[in-house]
Amino acid sequence: QTPEYVMIMNEMIHDARIVRIDSAHVSEEIRKWLGDSIGWWEGDTLVIETTNFREQTGLLVASRNLTVTARLRALDGGHLQYSFTVDDPTVWTSPWSGDYVWVKSGERVYEYACHEGNYALGAVMKGARLLEGEAGSK
């Protein structure tokens, strides 16, 4: 975090959302997987408005008109209150909202790799080395 930027990183696939503080949105023709996020402070709450999502966002239902407004506020113990409102007048008849607490885990964020937790990976690698060895002896 700097005075001009806040980064929100998701451990899954290392998605990093860069929030530009006190800035304007980029041209609506520039579309990003995670949208274009700008933010500003309202007291102790960071308000983040995200627009310009790519149409292939991975969301079940969304259009080019999707706007997500989020509010982040620090709580005791290092936790964060996360509130959001989804507005897409092309898809929904009215905006809808939700909120939850991001609980501070105290754990490190590790590099995301699809093989983590795949206990068969050892056998897969052993088989690959065996095939490589056979190919090398020919």
Residue ranges with predicted function:
Residues 1-138:
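Hydrophobic small-molecule pocket/channel-lining residues, especially in calycin-type beta-barrels
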